[in-house]
Amino acid sequence: MTDINHYLGNPLLKKANVPVEWNKDQILEYQKCMQDPLYFCQKYIKIVSLDEGLVPFDVYPFQKEILGTIHNNRFTICKLPRQSGKTTTIISYILHYVLFNEQMRVAILANKAATARDILSRLQLAYENLPKWLQQGVMSWNKGSLDLENGSRIVASSTSSSAVRGGSYNMIFLDEFAFVPHNVAEDF
């Protein structure tokens, strides 16, 4: 791809409306990824390890269970300890969700806007490291939101009573919900 095919000159991002030539193996791989979120996460998601830098996402058994639970249930509540990889698991699933489904609206909400934006930036890092043939073209890309050419959108915001007011969302990820004041939590 030439520079004009990249979003704002970023060679890691495919610009919207850029045709991609697929070979047979890529078509089969795309179908496999579309049908199996776990396969997609294990094969294509990259994360930052504090010790090793950028590495493939090594999915633990409890994370496999979380992915299956989220994929097969409309509502999911997970009560998990800190630093267990739950956010990495969820953002991997969110990425799968918006890539392989059109017109999806996802809200990432956390007790602080900075936390929500950090989660979105981790998702964006994983997105940048996908092969171009797996990427949807990028319409907009910033610290607070991501819009893809398939009509899917992800927004990051602090958890407040007005955070998602006026919008319709297919998925809402509430991180650090224990730190949200009870009067705000009741609005959800």
Predicted regions and their residues:
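Phosphate/NTP-binding elements of NTP-utilizing enzymes
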Residues: 1-188
